[in-house]
Amino acid sequence: MEIPNEEIKFLKKEDIKNINLNGMNKKERYEIWKKIPKVELHCHLDLTFSGKFFLKWVRKYNLQPNMTDDQVLDHYLFTKEGKSLAEFIRKAISVSDIYRDYDILEDLAKWAVIEKYKEGVVLMEFRYSPTFVSSSHGLDIELIHKAFVKGIKNATEMLNNKIYVALICISDTGHSAASIKHSGDFAIKHKHDFVGFDHGGREIDLKDHKDVYHSVRNHGLHLTVHAGEDATLPNLNTLYTAINILNVERIGHGIRVSESEELIELVKKNNILLEVCPISNLLLNNVKSMDTHPIRKLFDAGVKVSVNSDDPGMFLTDINDNYEKLYIHLNFTLEEFMTMNNWALEKSFVNDDIKSKLKTMYF
């Protein structure tokens, strides 16, 4: 696991006016994206890995021995456009087959933190689902959590604490009241390790589970849920429930807010940030093209949005690929990217002391 030798020279606000992106090639632009001090709020730790990392563990466990490396990646991962959230979930469940012991989880967490630092992330809120990770091979969720926390701690120490990492707990398998409550209880039990609670996977209306979310909040954790992502849902009820009943502070994805002027005004009134994941939305067929992605409409309407990578292991992408897409297809500027990262820092679930320190250092 390679530790970067040189520190990233992050851009300051005053540096931006001297940078002309139009005169740069792709490689030069990526150097700029890396130097933006990024706050990433929506990334699934349990689905953050490189193709090389994934193949290492597939071969170690002798899975798919008759497939070439390319065939393995195509079989498990989700790198092509035009599929669906349902197909993505099916593939993600198949990926969980590699979660066979706690060593891989510690290794994965360590790798993920180091890679995020290399990408120029200064504050990283990872999220993971204990029930998802344990689903294939019955790993103990307490030991899963211990492995992830240990891997994160080891990586941040290796990096001399140059990246701050926080954790969000997800409830996402089963969707029964018992399953969601179990995840909520787990988050509360480990509230000193988690900063927030989420619901992911298949998008559902969570109104019948409001008591779990209110209980989690009452124990000091912040709330965000996946909502307004799935373009196939017949209405926007998941968003209204998230805002009006769960009283979330952020929404995972939330791009369908753009379909309703009422919702646009509602998220602005409630100071809710949308954790937007552009490449994910395209690959899961929730937007027709990057040129028509609603993040531009939302940003221009004054909705707080941030840029995120979602499941970079499944897509074999990173956070800077998302910046490149937004620049090429929607003409986002460096000033606008800095604004979004300021919003992300403001709406992060970490404590105010950490926010103040990071703001002084980078913003």
Swiss-Prot record:
GO terms for molecular function: 5'-methylthioadenosine deaminase activity; adenosine deaminase activity; metal ion binding. A purine D-ribonucleoside binds at H44, L45, D46, D172, G201, E229, H253, D310. Pathway: Purine metabolism; purine nucleoside salvage. GO terms for cellular component: cytosol; external side of plasma membrane. It catalyses: adenosine + H2O + H(+) = inosine + NH4(+); S-methyl-5'-thioadenosine + H2O + H(+) = S-methyl-5'-thioinosine + NH4(+). The keyword Hydrolase applies. One of its GO terms (biological process) is inosine biosynthetic process. Binds 1 zinc ion per subunit. PANTHER family: ADENOSINE DEAMINASE. This is Adenosine deaminase. It comes from Plasmodium berghei (strain Anka). The gene is ADA.
